[in-house]
Amino acid sequence: MANIERFYTKFHPTSYQIKLAISRETKEIKGTTTITGEALSSQIDIHQKDLQIEELRVDGTAGDFTVDQAAEAIHVKLPRIGTVTLEIKYTTKLTDTMMGIYPSYYEVNGETKQLVGTQFETTFARQAFPCVDEPEAKATFDLAIKFDEHPGEVVLSNMPETKVEDGYHYFERTVKMSTYLIAFAFGDLQSKQTKTKSGVQVGVFATKAHQPQELDFALDIAKRAIEFYEDFYQTPYPLPHSWQLALPDFSAGAMENWGLVTYREAYLLLDPKNTTLRTKQVVATVIAHELAHQWFGDLVTMQWWDDLWLNESFANMMEYVAVDALEPDWQIWELFQNSEAGAALQRDATDGVQSVHVQVNDPAEIDALFDGAIVYAKGARMLVMVRALIGDVALRQGLQKYFASHQYGNATGNDLWQALGEAANMPIGDIMHTWLDQPGYPVVTAQVENGDLVLEQQQFFIGEGQAQQRQWQIPLNGNYAEVPALLQTKTLNLGNYQDLRDRNQQPFRLNVGNSSHFIVRYDQRLLDDILADWEQLTAIDQLQLLQDLRLLAEGKQISYAEIVPLLPRFAKTDSALVTEMLYRVANDLKKFVAPQSSAEKQLKKFFGELSQAPAQRLGWQAAPGETNDDQLMRPMVLKAALYAENPAVTAQAHQLFEENEAQLPKLPAAIRSLVIRNEVEHFGSPELFARLLKEYQRTSDASYKSDLCQALTATPSLPLIQQLVQQFENAQVIKPQDLRAWFRGVLANPQGQGPAWNWIRDEWQWLEDTVGGDMEFATYITVIAGIFQTPTHLAEFKAFFEPKLATPGLTREITMDIKVIETRVALIETERDAVQAAVAQAIK
């Protein structure tokens, strides 16, 4: 395993002057980079990747250097230490990997066009210009770009443009910043712009394949988010502008480049006349996440990648804080509970999972750090826990001090805890180290022993696990006055239970509000007490009850069969939050039945009973003045009713398709994917399939594209599935950025499992060549592990991936995913009969 050598230890750059001449036609790039900095050694190293170095001068004299492609480095011998200026001339090419400098392709009126953009996080700035490509190596940047320019085209960067000279567009010098946050783009763009109260210019940019009104929502959210953060952080936005740019080809979801934030089109643009509340929520949280980074990540940056959580966890929490302030009616924390909290609790219960704060031993491991369920979701839950513990006043005071102390510099997690701890007068660091530096989380067992109410913590596992006597300082958030704020010991006796119950006059509960990262296992007496009064619980507390029971069943601490009879009572809810968790649990039952079996017929009947009343109440059409919950619930219950083969719901979907066949994009966005999928599954033909696939290629509406992908991958026709799989490597049909969704859709289809699994094994090298530099590459393995559930597939998975265990960046993912499948296979074997019997009993 190659250890990472930190180039910053020998050379501290202070400024860069970068001139780039780029041709879209030939894909050639000619560059000159001048770096001034402080050499601490006579032998320094500069990062480069795939650059052809033509000349390197040191203080104006020909330099002594060697290029080391394996180390992605230029080794430079200097005549002396101290201040030095390097001038490096080089050539390279536009990449085709969505990393470095690369073209995006799109169509306007049948004409293919190119928009060139960049993606430099984590270590791809070195593909664009020689640099010390490490977060700590902050410097200023003077950028000039020349390209094969056509009239009306726009060029953007982190800072405003100052002049055009000899075809080069010059930009204002940046503030001191990290290389991975540099960005630029050029092409035929449209924009809408406004200003914040403090005078920051805010703009949204997109290709002209989109309607102008698709930019409006993002512009409004971006402007108000910046204003919110300036107030919340008590720290001004530090740049003259904040551009939001939608790129047609983009491997990540979005990227927080300072002053020029880049996004997938699906996460920035939406049609205000036909969208869903959930789409608005997702787009708003993505924008708020990236803009939170402009302070937390950009102004103050982690010192090294092992503190990546410091950037991502904080932005993940703040996106919800901001959107909740901007759109309080949305109840956005409910989205956090169902997406972030659930993902973190599931992933973090597998033995071998990374901790939030994790060491990086190999350069290839940096991208593998971006584990959404841990670094983003669990980390955000840790910070939500801190916020609940110290309150917003101390949080804001601490952040203001943190930004003032470290602005334009770097920081570690300890710096943040120190600032927050001083503001709150609490030992935040001591509490948080137990959560950030060790993986996993506890289950707190609450039981009545010899008349006393006793709490006990132990590490919770889904599957086999080595507990290692880990212990946490747990914010208990109990609803009895006698419960301390923190559980700091393994066990705690709260005293006589009946006395406690009589005094408090309510069922005993822990983690009220579900803001702490643990689950609770109540003994039967305590659980029955809660369930007897379950309708009095808030929606979040009902979700938590279902969520904890589900996880306990996944961990074999209780049986899924015990949960089945509870589900019908939760089906009566009017809460979208509870409904979403209800169907999460109900969908988990599908693994216990074989497709087309008599057991699945019974499960479908159970789904029918769960969804019958709400589907009838909500119907396919939105009612005037209906609640946000009704809007969000409609697709959930209709999807369940379609799985149940509810004849009325299926017929209504077919009728809606026929009535709107000539204008499918105009179907209400909330139900469109269900209507089209139902048609493909039950009334499809090769002609319809071909037509929808053509529509997928033609449309620039990301939401409609997603709907078509979901529908087409659900076809029951094996020949049509095989046609789809043949298009996986055809970027004219399926862009590499979208391939994972298509692969997952086909693999999840019982008819498609064989073709998709064969394809990825046969074409693994192609996949690695195409998206191997992408931080999402390893998630193809996660997708497979999320679906496979038979001993045969487990054996095939191990046979294919175990030889790849030594691949840096894949080791942890493969190891964990083998455990995930093993655990699921064992759970099905143990629980199948009991679950099927419970379902049969529930529908009698």
Give the location of each predicted region:
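Short alpha-helical hairpin
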Residues: E111, K195-G199, V261-T262, T350-H357, ...
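Short conserved micro-motifs at the rims of enzyme active sites and ligand-binding pockets
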Residues: M99-G100, L181-A185, L215-F217, K273-T275, ...
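Non-catalytic accessory/interaction domains
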Residues: A144-K146, A206, A292, Q359-P363, ...
